[in-house]
């Protein structure tokens, strides 16, 4: 089976969030048994092309977007995946000067790339074309209007239903879409506005989200009734599939960043397992200047953004100070107000013996925290899937979550973690923290059972890939 994914980020090349990681994991698992290709734009300021001798092909092609255009497709293989990067030769201003993936002109830029990608797919042929989020939503309409050879199915995965790609009809008219297919993207209430996600929903053969609960949640999203109508119309061709994590990348067995490696098998003698985590905790506390070495350690490894529940993060700080346990927060702030608030907290708590706030992201430090911490807190307002809780469980770190989206699908309260539900109830959140910390301190048998359940949780990529293959073959 030949599968082509189209997206605007892919973790080995460039990424801004979970989409890039999820696509990489899925493509890697599929590539084990199927011809798998990922098509993304080339961002010259953000990624350097492999040397020419490492490329497997360089193709020139034409596409139509705001007139006849030309592009170059550079292809190479990475871990069995064919990666194709598009340089828009006659529209270089769209990507060549971009210093971030996302800019203020995304709809036009991503539609131009989608037009080039669709032209390439029509030329190359594929059995499955798999789109990721609204960014490449135009590809669905273009391939429905002019299918490629051997095309069996167009699949759309919604990594974040909150972003939809609102744009103008004028931009859709710049493509080769005819009036019928433009109407699939158009808002009835405002014919001059088109929504790339809306058209992709109608033009795809199957729609997936990244967790079963998130699939149910988006059917109850009434923030735009026309988008609600579109997703409701596809509900019989909608399925939630949990992302997996790459256990060869994430795991304490061989992670070179840890003070002490450890395995799930060590848990046959729990004291040896917890001794290994304690050695990682001691090493981390020395790095961060923390002193409550024998207290429970809770971590938050997250972007600090409204989606991630920053109001709960502040409550966690207060709770840790009141209850004498360690709290470590690491992540980049999004938004000036949040940055100012957390920078002030960081400064005021700089000498705290049990709280550290690090307003940056370090992959090495994140891994050390996963291994050292006893618990990881993820109080998200919404979470389509979430990989952090799965990574935490791989390291034997118990997740404390809000029961939404993929967090609800992966964490069972009192079984392999702790959860709360109300997105605005500080009392419920603090009760969850208290229960988790008290269990750690006073009920060692129950804590061992919870950690064991975390280690037994299956989050491998192959499970997710097989579920996608079922959809491809339907």
Curated annotation (Swiss-Prot):
Biological processes annotated in GO: glycogen biosynthetic process
Family matches, as Pfam families: Glyco_transf_5, Glycos_transf_1
EC code(s) of this entry: 2.4.1.21
Annotated residues for binding of ADP-alpha-D-glucose: 15
GO MF entries: alpha-1,4-glucan glucosyltransferase (ADP-glucose donor) activity; alpha-1,4-glucan glucosyltransferase (UDP-glucose donor) activity
UniProt entry keywords in alphabetical sequence: Glycogen biosynthesis, Glycosyltransferase, Transferase
Top-level taxon of the source organism: Bacteria
Catalytic activity: [(1->4)-alpha-D-glucosyl](n) + ADP-alpha-D-glucose = [(1->4)-alpha-D-glucosyl](n+1) + ADP + H(+)
Pathways per UniProt: Glycan biosynthesis; glycogen biosynthesis
InterPro entries the record matches: Glyco_trans_1, GS/SS, Starch_synth_cat_dom
SUPFAM superfamilies: UDP-Glycosyltransferase/glycogen phosphorylase
The family this protein is said to belong to: Belongs to the glycosyltransferase 1 family. Bacterial/plant glycogen synthase subfamily.
Family matches, as PANTHER family: GLYCOGEN SYNTHASE 2-RELATED, PTHR46083
Job description of the protein: Synthesizes alpha-1,4-glucan chains using ADP-glucose.
Stated name of the protein: Glycogen synthase
Species the sequence originates in: Chlamydia trachomatis serovar A (strain ATCC VR-571B / DSM 19440 / HAR-13)
């Amino acid at each position: 089976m030949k599968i082509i994914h189209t997206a605007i980020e892919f973790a080995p090349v460039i990424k801004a969030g979970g989409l890039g990681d999820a696509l990489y994991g899925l493509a890697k698992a599929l590539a084990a048994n199927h011809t798998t290709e990922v098509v993304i734009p080339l961002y010259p300021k953000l990624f350097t092309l492999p040397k020419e001798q490492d490329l497997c092909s360089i193709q020139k092609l034409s596409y139509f977007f705001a007139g006849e255009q030309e592009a170059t497709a550079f292809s190479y293989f990475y871990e069995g995946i064919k990666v194709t990067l598009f340089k828009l030769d006659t529209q270089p201003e769209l990507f060549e000067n971009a210093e971030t993936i996302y800019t203020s002109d995304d709809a036009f830029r991503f539609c131009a790339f989608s037009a080039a990608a669709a032209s390439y797919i029509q030329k190359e042929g594929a059995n499955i074309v798999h789109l990721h989020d609204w960014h490449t939503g135009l590809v669905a309409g273009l391939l429905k209007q002019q299918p490629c050879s051997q095309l069996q199915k167009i699949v759309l995965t919604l990594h974040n239903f909150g972003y939809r790609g609102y744009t103008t009809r004028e931009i859709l008219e710049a493509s080769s879409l005819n009036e019928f297919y433009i109407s699939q993207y158009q808002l009835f209430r405002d014919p001059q506005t088109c929504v790339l996600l809306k058209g992709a929903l109608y033009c795809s053969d199957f729609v997936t989200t990244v967790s079963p609960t998130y699939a149910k949640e988006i059917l109850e999203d009434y923030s735009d009734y026309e988008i609600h109508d579109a997703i409701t119309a596809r509900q019989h061709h909608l399925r939630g599939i949990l992302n997996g994590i790459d256990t060869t990348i994430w795991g304490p067995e061989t992670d070179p960043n840890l003070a002490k490696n450890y395995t799930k098998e060590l848990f046959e003698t729990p004291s040896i397992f917890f001794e290994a985590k304690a050695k990682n905790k001691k090493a981390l506390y020395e790095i961060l200047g923390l002193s409550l070495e024998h207290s429970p350690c809770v971590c938050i490894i997250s972007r600090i953004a409204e989606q991630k529940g920053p109001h709960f993060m502040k409550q966690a700080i207060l709770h840790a100070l009141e209850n004498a346990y360690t709290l470590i927060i690491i992540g980049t702030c999004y938004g000036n107000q949040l940055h100012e608030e957390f920078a002030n907290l960081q400064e005021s708590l700089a000498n705290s013996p049990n709280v550290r706030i690090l307003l940056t992201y370090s992959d090495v430090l994140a891994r050390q925290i996963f291994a050292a911490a006893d618990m990881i807190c993820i109080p998200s307002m919404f979470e389509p899937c979430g990989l952090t809780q799965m990574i935490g469980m791989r390291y034997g770190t118990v997740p404390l979550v809000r029961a939404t989206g993929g967090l609800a699908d992966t964490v069972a309260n009192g079984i392999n973690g702790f959860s709360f539900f109300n997105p605005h109830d500080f009392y419920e959140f603090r009760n969850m923290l208290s229960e988790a910390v008290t269990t750690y301190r006073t009920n060692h048998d129950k804590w061992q059972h919870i950690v064991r359940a975390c280690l037994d949780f299956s989050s491998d990529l192959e499970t997710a890939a097989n579920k996608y293959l079922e959809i491809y073959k339907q």
